[in-house]
Amino acid sequence: MSPQEANDSNFKAKPFSRVVLECQNLSYVFPNGNIAYQNINLETSQDELVAIVGPTGTGKSTLLRNLSYLIPPTTGKIFLEGKEIRHPSSSISLIHQSIATFPWMNASDNVKIGLTGQRITEEQASQIVEDMLSLVGLKDFADYYPKEMSGGMRQRIAIARALAASPKVLLMDEPFVHLDELTANNLRQEIYQLVFSTETTLDSAILVSHNLHEVVQLADRVYVMCGSPATIVDEIKIDLPRPRTERDTHFLDYLDHLLADLKPKCQV
């Protein structure tokens, strides 16, 4: 962490002690009998962003859906703060690859959808929506519709909606893949501090990405998935100060390390 971030009152400390989300011996078998992955063991710690990388077809996106229980795993257990979960929970939010906004709703209503099922008043809901839009820098665009916003703005709406339900864990499935590189890079620069702001309830986050530069830029730890059926073949801790830049030789060292680790194991 950079000295500037360490002194930022809006940025949480990083003790990396308490386990937040954990899965044990997780496996998933598709209805056709194909095994997506097997015996997956991973965990996230307090205020930690964990990345999952691996070739296409190794079940990374499926794993995120299993962790959120949108699709139950076939075998294994998932724990949130030490308690086993067996159904979808508002404590775990998932951002999909596609930029999911409802075109007939303005920004406020798109975020408000994330509060469906919450036992709160209309006034409380409106305040949460306003707070989340402010957090992602879109407070002045509350009445705008998706067609009036850029791809980056729409993705911010998706992030605000995911955070509105006060989750403890945020799962991100290739969140920048459909953005142009300039927009994606700008959002990457902000996402780490955004999700771990003291203004959110998040304790940890998991990112699935094929972009290794993105992974080194954002992740505290990386799990590598390979094989068929896929398993976790490596775990890499990335110990770099923030904000991170590719101009840093240590950044490039981690990138080379990750590439060298992936090639013989995954042939990518």
PLM regions: where:
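Helix-to-loop junction immediately C-terminal to a conserved catalytic motif
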Residues: 68
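Conserved ABC transporter NBD signature motif
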Residues: 76-88
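Conserved ABC ATPase "signature" region
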Residues: 112, 123-141, 190-196
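Short coil-to-helix segment of the ABC ATPase nucleotide-binding domain corresponding to the Q-loop/switch region
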Residues: 105-112
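Conserved ABC ATPase signature
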Residues: 145-149, 153
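Conserved catalytic motifs of ABC-family nucleotide-binding domains
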Residues: 166
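The feature captures the beta-strand-to-loop junction immediately N-terminal to the Walker
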Residues: 53-55
